[in-house]
Design a protein with these regions (language model features):
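A detector for small-residue-rich transmembrane helices and their helix-helix packing motifs
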Residues: 1-155
């Protein structure tokens, strides 16, 4: 399995339009959470990390489960990406998904508490990451065409 296959198959699964909508909504959700927690800050929020975090969260709904591309099956068959996504109930019972979620949130908590550890003077808007991630995790079923219709505008 090539690294770019798992990274970009979410766009293939959604189609271009849905993928861009998910990305934009996750970016806005991340910015809104950051704004809610830092309403008096005068520092602008710049970056795509909330959108990327949302894409990662959306991928957990199908890519980390058993038989899925990152869940131990290295076959390159496209039908893997046509299987219905897991519900939140299934996700919380899957040890691979829970390990990923704990590591992801743990890294963001450490970055939020300790900082990035770099010499740059800027900070990382970890709150935006969390907002984008939660949006992607929760909104995935609303945008996922699998089981209903195949997207006509595949990437």
């Amino acid at each position: 399995l090539r690294w770019d296959a798992w990274l970009f198959r979410g766009a293939w699964r959604f189609g271009t339009t849905r993928f861009l909508v998910l990305s934009a909504v996750c970016a806005v959700a991340g910015a809104m959470l950051h704004l809610a927690l830092h309403s008096n800050d005068m520092v602008p929020l710049v970056g795509a990390s909330a959108a990327i975090s949302g894409q990662m969260a959306a991928a957990t709904r199908f890519a980390l489960l058993a038989g899925m591309p990152l869940g131990g099956m290295a076959a390159g068959h496209n039908e893997i990406y046509r299987r219905p996504a897991a519900t939140l109930g299934v996700l919380i019972r899957d040890s691979r998904v829970m390990t990923f979620l704990l590591v992801w949130f743990g890294v963001n908590a450490v970055v939020g508490i300790v900082g990035s550890g770099t010499l740059s003077s800027g900070s990382i808007a970890w709150e935006a990451h969390v907002g984008g991630f939660l949006a992607g995790l929760l909104l995935f079923p609303l945008l996922d065409p699998v089981g209903t219709e195949a997207p006509a505008d595949r990437v």
